[in-house]
Amino acid sequence: LQAAKGTNVQVFVSTFYAEGGNKTFDDGIKAYINGNADAKTTNGGDDTISAVTAMGYDVYYVALEALKAAGSTDPAKVMEALPGVTYDGVSGHIAFDETGDAIRDTAYIKTIDTAANVWKFVTQQKAS
């Protein structure tokens, strides 16, 4: 985001979380960022919520569920258990296929408004 500021570059990204997708999560993360100068600095100087923050939050809890389902910390057992794990997180419903890839039904397409230095929502894509 910072690298594109003031340029005429066009960047489009797809993500599994759009800011505003979970008000409770957004409010909590923004309160943390705005209440911690270091967090705000490392967040680019503002309280924009990146999708990776929400997905990182979810992956922590998904990993805990996978460890519980496996009854072990052995990587092979966790991978074996993963297809049976589902989780309703801040970024939506998360499930896994037989190889451990996430099954998601919605992606959000965003672009950068280089003048305002913010992400702009473009469209939502739903799996058919």
Positions of the model-derived regions?
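Extracytosolic ligand-binding ectodomains
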Residues: L1-S128
